[in-house]
């Protein structure tokens, strides 16, 4: 995408958002819309690096301007989940994989409503093994709760900064 195309895409999304009326919407509808807006803005991918971080900062500022009390804590703790949830929101292919908004909506439900969805990437996998097929909500007794960390039978992350934060103060 060229700079002019990127500018037009960003301007289009921002103009659509400017024209959107949040009045009278339920909390679920607001979260649904904010999720869509966030994923669409992220999908433009205006930068070589830092698109997810930039989107997170923008969303924090935007939600604050709407009166929400938010900070970057959830983004810092679950940045990879946030990025992958946006991928799942917009991704489709010829093999029947369709966009799935629920993961990004659950991220925002945790942030805005204090819900406790388990925000681990294993639940975003397409065609996951049975034990990861249903993302648990940790604050409801009817949700499939996991009382302990699932075994590392299925790798869910790569070690990008191995032991860099370990200090041995002997």
Where in this protein do the model-derived segments appear?
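FIC/Doc superfamily catalytic core
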Residues: 1-170
């Amino acid at each position: 995408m060229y700079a002019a195309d990127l500018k037009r895409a960003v301007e289009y999304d921002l103009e659509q958002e400017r024209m959107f009326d949040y009045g009278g919407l339920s909390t679920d509808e607001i979260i649904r819309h904010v999720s869509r807006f966030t994923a669409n803005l992220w999908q433009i991918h205006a930068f070589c690096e830092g698109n997810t971080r930039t989107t997170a900062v923008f969303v924090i500022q935007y939600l604050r301007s709407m009166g929400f009390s938010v900070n970057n804590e959830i983004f810092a703790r679950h940045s990879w989940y946030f990025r992958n949830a946006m991928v799942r929101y917009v991704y489709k292919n010829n093999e029947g994989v369709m966009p799935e908004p629920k993961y990004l909506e659950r991220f925002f439900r945790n942030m805005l409503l204090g819900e406790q969805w388990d925000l681990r990437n294993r639940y975003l996998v397409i065609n996951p093994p049975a034990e990861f097929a249903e993302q648990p909500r940790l604050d409801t007794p009817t949700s499939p709760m996991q009382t302990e960390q699932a075994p590392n039978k299925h790798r869910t992350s790569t070690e990008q900064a191995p032991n860099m934060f370990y200090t041995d103060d002997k």
